[in-house]
Amino acid sequence: MAKAAGMKYMVLTTRHHEGFSLWDSKVNPFNSMNYGCHRDIVREFVDACRKEGLGIGFYSSLMDWRHPDGARCAYDDQARRRFLDYLEALNTELLTNYGKIDILWYDVPQPMESWEGWDSLARNQRLRALQPDIIINDRSRLKEDFGTPEGKIRVMDRDWEACMTFNDIAWGYLDEQQALPYAYSAQRILRMLNTCACNGGNLLLNVGPKPDGSIPADAIKPLTEVGKWLEKNGEAVYGQLHPNILSGSWFRGGNGISGITYGKDLKCVYLWNWISPEGGTMYYSGVFTEPVRVTKLSTGEDIEFRYTEDHRIELKGLHVEEGEFVPVYKIEFAEPMEYKPFHKYPQIWL
């Protein structure tokens, strides 16, 4: 499902706050080999990701409701030391028994309120020695490699990944009848993806599986639709230039009509057109470099355009196919494009 949806990596909740490990842990007997399905779910997850060419991330909760030192660690130093040794032993298992791992995704550094209390600097250095290429998120009370705004896409001036859940109300399983009114549509997922791509971030979209491990039906349809859209338009999403390279001159996230992503060499711009202009004509302003070609990304068809003396690109004959959700127009330049801020040159004219 993740591959079909166009995702490039997955993060598995290897152990959540209730302390249940989804692998054959020798440190924590409360695990999926001893209880429940009697399977090493982490192993199956890793094998499936490698088969499909997906990056591998491990979520690891710092808070643990089950461990006897999980609360005492905040005020008893001996309990703190025992608890930290326990957490590190768990993560050491994960980072030594399953080959190359790409992401360590900490969560909920409670009840201790400082990285010193968690001994995060030294522990993370030891874990990096096991996986030299791993990246670590910012939830061990250190900034580490990337930020993780949650529940709302908040742009950060660093590498970041928005952490969203599929229906906005539950991170675990919610029966389909209750979840359906809140389920994301393909359009809403694409809107989130656009906001992230426009602003140099990734989108991590949580889906709570059903009790049998399958994906709920209310998630399958929109994710499949997004995947099909990305098959044709993924060039506007994957590996695009971080907006900070333009030193703040580029508006972030679009203006309600369109959102922008652009190529690494600044020789192309991808215009995500949320609102189709009546009559099929739209003006894109503030561009001080003359384009050489405009195409519709999903079909490759050439779009008629005209570059005006007042630094506007007039796009003609724009149209939306049934079920297309949002068309993307690729504007190409012979040299890196120059753009002036929107407060001087209004950007989109319908």
What are these regions (language model features)?
Residues M1-L350:
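Mature catalytic domains of secreted/periplasmic carbohydrate-active enzymes
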